[in-house]
Amino acid sequence: MKKNRPGIAKMPFFIVAVLCLSIFSCNNESTQTQTETVQKPAAFVKKAPAFNEDSAYYWVQKQVAFGPRVPGSKAHANCASFIEKTLKDYGLTVVVQTAPITTYDNKIFNLKNIIASYKPEFQKRVLLLAHWDSRHIADNDTKDENKAIDGADDGGSGVAVLLEIARQLSKADLKVGVDLFFSDLEDYGQPDDSDKPKMQDSWCLGTQYWAKNMHVPGYTANYGILLDMVGAKGAIFPREGTGSYFAPDVVNKVWSTAKNLGYSSYFTDDNTGNTTDDHLYVNTIAKIPCIDIVHMSPVTGSYGEHHHTHKDTMDIIDKNTLKVVGQTVLEVLWQE
């Protein structure tokens, strides 16, 4: 049985009217108060310093000037020394991993992974990585297929952005640790038309080794960002499938940062299929959620036309693209 509220029906009309008005007034005031307490999302505020695209461009030039950084070559050795010295000059803690690695063609190379750490004592960490070796063949070209490529974009651009970030870190006081991982033997994978026995997981050998043999025992990071082919004119960076599968929150973090910086024409919301790149093994072996900022066509899923060809030279490198990627990653770090 419904319980009646006593006395309301017997009150004079004007009292009831006043009471109703009072109740309405109170309810309306409560509604206004509730409306006023709804907070709008905080406006985005830039925190990172300006990324120097001229400096990054110079770092690409420096690498290409050594020649193709094919494992076992003099250019490879010289470039390794250059990267290591530059990182140490910026005051970072540097570890060089070396190990004999067998490739699909049954050759043995002395692997050189280079890891530089900013504030290594901090538990909260972000991993940034790029491969520094270049492809030993031009298997996507129609001429000189068996000759090594310059690798200005594929290899050179990612390293250049990381070196410029290292320079900025040397002057910073962040509340997060950062590890810059320069992986070796990423691009010595088995070509599709190889006459050699099929080798499983022939790509990204440096990262596979690192993930199984951490440079610091028990190392981990909150998340990782891989930079691969991030310097070409007209580059587009869709949401790559492997990263979206393993680390969707990291993809959203980076792409929303790029959007807030006005870079939506570069960092698009298109989705691509999965790729086999260093971040695959960071996710599956090291168990660190990691994404890939990589130049891909959102329509065909293929990389840039210069990929693994002799067109991958300084002629295709664009300072604006280096700026967009570098500034986005810097902002992600500074927002931490």
Functional labels for PLM-detected ranges:
Residues 98, 223, 230-336:
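Active-site-adjacent substrate-binding region
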Residues 2-13:
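Bacterial N-terminal signal peptides that target proteins for export
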Residues 22-25:
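C-terminal motif of bacterial Sec signal peptides marking the signal peptidase cleavage site
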Residues 28-38:
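Bacterial Sec signal peptide processing site at the extreme N-terminus
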Residues 68-121:
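A non-catalytic alpha/beta surface segment that caps or lines the substrate-entry region
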Residues 44-50, 65-74, 101-104, 145-155, ...:
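Second-shell loop/turn segments in exported
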Residues 147-249:
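Acidic/histidine-rich catalytic neighborhood of metal-dependent amide-processing enzymes
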Residues 38-79, 90, 301-316:
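N-terminal capping segment at the start of a domain
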